[in-house]
């Protein structure tokens, strides 16, 4: 395959090959110039069956008939303009009858859309509600990760029920043999060659009918793994947590529990990776070099698992999640099992792992423990900081109750620590899109439905976003202890690159307000407490719990002192 001709052909070759690796080997090709890169790739793809179709409308129905007989989709390949529109009747039929169909359309580059360029329409979302899903592939670029391209294709076609649309934009040159204006980087060519030569799909999604086989394959991987790692994100049901406790015992692998997993108090602390956000902890994980990573749940607070650890790891990544869609920001998942965590654990038949490298595991966990104790010693005892608040409250929230964590600095601080002793606390957070509004209302809603008291820890800006929910707080039959960390504004920006631009940082980012919140609590007849030291926080929190009704606890801290503590904390290294 002439991958080196130009980026259009390189991308087209990978797209076509990935479809073939997923079992989609029959292509219904209609002629055109804009889809020439796709046709060129198909000509060189010996594993593909190519059927030439003059009329796209008839091609659509031909592919529909193929899918009805073969039980898997045919792939329709066309140029831009009215060509993909001619598939519409067949697309509607496929949608209503749940027949798998893949449309692979070429498109003009975005700068030509809406410019009166010839043979150009707005092709994204062309089929509207009659398309199960769609993927917009941008013009080929050396800066776009090829792994992301393949992972998105695999995710799109993993559930073959109804039509899906892959729309590929291309700039010139559209034909093979003509190079781009800039040579393709050697590193990109090497990556493309490696991905093209892979025997199977980049990410495999065993279907419900083949989950048993998928589990057997995973069992084999687990049983031959010497150094493994379990990563637990937000879980989906009450049966998941005890199942993962049991799995962690059986495997004997180190475990990272995201704070939102509610698992920090359920996995023994001497088996836990306390943080993936601390540079030295991340270095230790990388040096441990896990061969297999089992990833449960969705989302992680720390971006470094996806941004720093996975891209440089050679581990086989197995993701277990019942949620639909691509959930892989690093585009590194090798096997995706669409099932609840508890069902995965129940379906496994694990034996004692003869391959486990217990020595490497113990050395790794011992180093983590040494680092954790060093970090604890660096947190000032007499002054408040996010680190001190998080460390203390993780041991103070009563067992069996709820802990709501606001976004921004709050949840990141709690994610860096482990529970000091075993406990079952339900951690609640709004991490879907990580907004800072509605935090108080969410806490009240959880407390009312679960009939369990909730301690809600939020920042001052989050509090100001949801002032009207103080009425809900006051009226809640189940108490919510609202802890507001008042550091005078949105101080997370002082830890981001924008800090180097003071003319932007303040007031535009940090939005300082100079307020305290005692009078607001009084307005709603809520008990109010204030703390400015660790000792005051402990006493005030105990008093708020003793009130046995909703209460407000305002914690004031010096943002400059807190920033110094954070910087000292992050700079700790092992000898």
From Swiss-Prot:
Role of this protein: Catalyzes the thiamine diphosphate-dependent decarboxylation of 2-oxoglutarate and the subsequent addition of the resulting succinic semialdehyde-thiamine pyrophosphate anion to isochorismate to yield 2-succinyl-5-enolpyruvyl-6-hydroxy-3-cyclohexene-1-carboxylate (SEPHCHC).
Q: What do we know about how this protein assembles, alone or with others?
A: Homodimer.
Please state which protein family the record places this protein in.
Belongs to the TPP enzyme family. MenD subfamily.
Pfam family, any one = TPP_enzyme_N
Q: Which cofactor does it need?
A: Mg(2+); Mn(2+); thiamine diphosphate
**Which transformation does this protein catalyse, written as a reaction?**
isochorismate + 2-oxoglutarate + H(+) = 5-enolpyruvoyl-6-hydroxy-2-succinyl-cyclohex-3-ene-1-carboxylate + CO2
GO MF terms here are:
2-succinyl-5-enolpyruvyl-6-hydroxy-3-cyclohexene-1-carboxylic-acid synthase activity; magnesium ion binding; manganese ion binding; thiamine pyrophosphate binding
PANTHER family (alphabetical): 2-SUCCINYL-5-ENOLPYRUVYL-6-HYDROXY-3-CYCLOHEXENE-1-CARBOXYLATE SYNTHASE, PROTEIN PHYLLO, CHLOROPLASTIC
The UniProt entry, under Gene3D superfamilies, shows: 3.40.50.970, TPP-binding domain
The UniProt entry, under SUPFAM superfamilies, shows: DHS-like NAD/FAD-binding domain, Thiamin diphosphate-binding fold (THDP-binding)
Which pathway, metabolic or otherwise, does it act in? Quinol/quinone metabolism; 1,4-dihydroxy-2-naphthoate biosynthesis; 1,4-dihydroxy-2-naphthoate from chorismate: step 2/7; Quinol/quinone metabolism; menaquinone biosynthesis
Q: Which InterPro entries match?
A: DHS-like_NAD/FAD-binding_dom (IPR029035), MenaQ_synth_MenD (IPR004433), MenD_middle (IPR032264), THDP-binding (IPR029061), Thiamin_PyroP_enz_TPP-bd_dom (IPR012001), TPP_enzyme_TPP-bd (IPR011766)
Q: Which GO terms describe its biological process?
A: menaquinone biosynthetic process
What EC number(s) does this enzyme carry?
2.2.1.9
Comment on bound cofactor: Binds 1 thiamine pyrophosphate per subunit.
Asked if the record carries the keyword Magnesium, the reply is yes
Give the top-level enzyme category: transferase
- Which superkingdom is the protein from? Bacteria
What is the designated name of this protein? Answer: 2-succinyl-5-enolpyruvyl-6-hydroxy-3-cyclohexene-1-carboxylate synthase
- HAMAP family, sorted: MenD
Any idea which UniProt keywords this protein has? Magnesium, Manganese, Menaquinone biosynthesis, Metal-binding, Thiamine pyrophosphate, Transferase
